[in-house]
Amino acid sequence: MEFLKKVDPDIFGLIEEEDQRQRRNIELIASENFVSDAVMEAAGSCLTNKYAEGYPHKRYYGGCEVVDKVEELAIARARELFGAEHVNVQPHSGSQANQAVYFATVPPGGTILAMDLTHGGHLTHGSPVNMSGKYYNFIHYGVTREEEVIDFDQVRELARKHQPDLIVAGASAYPRIIDFEVFREIADEVGALFMVDMAHIAGLVAAGLHPSPVPVADFVTTTTHKTLRGTRGGLILCKGEHAKKIDKAIFPGLQGGPLLHIIAAKAVTFKEALQDEFKGYQKQIVSNAKTMAAELKNYGFRLVSGGTDNHLMLVDLTNMDITGKDAETALDKVGITVNKNTIPFEKRSPFVTSGIRIGTPAVTTRGMKEKEMKLIAKLIYQTLKNINDEGRLTEIRQEVYRLSERFPKTAE
C-alpha cells in the first residue's frame, strides 16, 4: 500500500492499526472471517471504476463487455455451488438481499412471519427499529422455553392465525440445525411463500454439513462473508419462476449500479468454496465449535439449547452473575473478541444483554484446531472469573498474544 501511505498517511496508519488488531486478537465474532489475498485483490481491482447499471447484455451503459463476463462467471459459480435455478449476485449486502425479497413478494403492510430477534433472528427480520419492521407487518415466532429450539407448534399456530404472505426461516444467533422441510410444509398449508436467510450457515450448506434450503425454499438469501469466507456482500438464490421479479426488485427497485469489483471478489469466493479443501475447512469449523462448547460447559457455563450443531454458540451468563456487555468488555481487554448478545426470553436491554455469542470461522481460518479451542475456553473462563483483577487480565492477554503469534492471520 505504498501509494496509500504516500497520499493519505492517516488512513494508511489506521488500516495498519486494524491489521495489527486482527493479527493480535483471537477473533470469535461468529459473523467475521479472514478473506484470502485473491479475494482481497479482486475487491481492490480496477473494476471499481466501471459503471454497469442493469444485467449482463442488458446494460444502460456502454463498455460492459468485460464486466458482463465477470458477472456471468460469478452467477455460474454460485449456481454450481448451491444448485440454484436462478442467482442474483448484485445485492450489496445481506440486508439488501432480504429487502429485495420482501419488496418482490409482499405489498406494503403485508404480513411476514419470521424469527424474533431476541430468540436468534436478525434485525432485518422485522425489528421495529429496522426498515423491514416499519414497512411490513411482521409476526414473530421463537424457541421453546425448555429445549430452546425452534417452536414449530408456535410457527404453525401463528401461520394459521395470521395467514402471512411470506414465511422466513434463518437466524443470526441460533446454534442448531434448522428443519427447512417443516417450514415448507407450514408455508404450503397457509399458501405462503417461503424464504430462508442462510447468511450464517452458507459455508456449511455449500460443504454439505447443513441441509440445503435451496431445493425447498422459494427464495434463499445470504451474505458472501461469514462462513463462506468471502468478500462482504449479498446473494439471492431463487426458483426460476421468481427470477424476473427478484432481478427487478434489485435493479431498478433498490439499487443502481452494481459493485463490479465486489462481484469479481464474489466469483473468487465461490471458486474457493468449490474446492475440496473448503469442505475440510467447514468440518473443522463445526468440530472446533463443538469442542469449545463442550469445554465451556465443563467450566460451568450454560449454553443456550445445550450446545451447537454449527459454527456458533450462545452463552447464557446469568449463572455467572455477569452481563453480556461486561463480558465483552473484559474479554476485549485480554484480546478475545466476542459480541454481547440477547438470549431467548431476555430480561435485560439489548445494550446490556445476558449472553455472548461465540463463533469459530475466523480462528479456524487461522489454522487453530481442537487443542486451541480448549485453551481459548480456559482463557475465557479465567478472564470472566478474574474480571476485576487487572494484573491477572494482563497475564491472560500475554497468553492470548502468544497464541495469536503461532497462527498467522491468513485464508491461504
Swiss-Prot record:
A Pfam entry, by short name: SHMT
Cofactors required: pyridoxal 5'-phosphate
Xref: Gene3D superfamilies: Aspartate Aminotransferase, domain 1, Type I PLP-dependent aspartate aminotransferase-like (Major domain)
GO cellular component: cytosol
Positions with a binding annotation for (6S)-5,6,7,8-tetrahydrofolate: L117, G121, H122, L123, S349, P350, F351
Organism domain of life: Bacteria
Enzyme class: transferase
Entry keyword annotation includes Amino-acid biosynthesis: yes
Quaternary context: Homodimer.
PANTHER family linked to this entry: SERINE HYDROXYMETHYLTRANSFERASE, SERINE HYDROXYMETHYLTRANSFERASE 1
HAMAP family: SHMT
Similarity remark: Belongs to the SHMT family.
Name under which the protein is recorded: Serine hydroxymethyltransferase
Organism of provenance: Halothermothrix orenii (strain H 168 / OCM 544 / DSM 9562)
Classification lineage: Bacteria, Bacillati, Bacillota, Clostridia, Halanaerobiales
Gene that specifies this protein: glyA
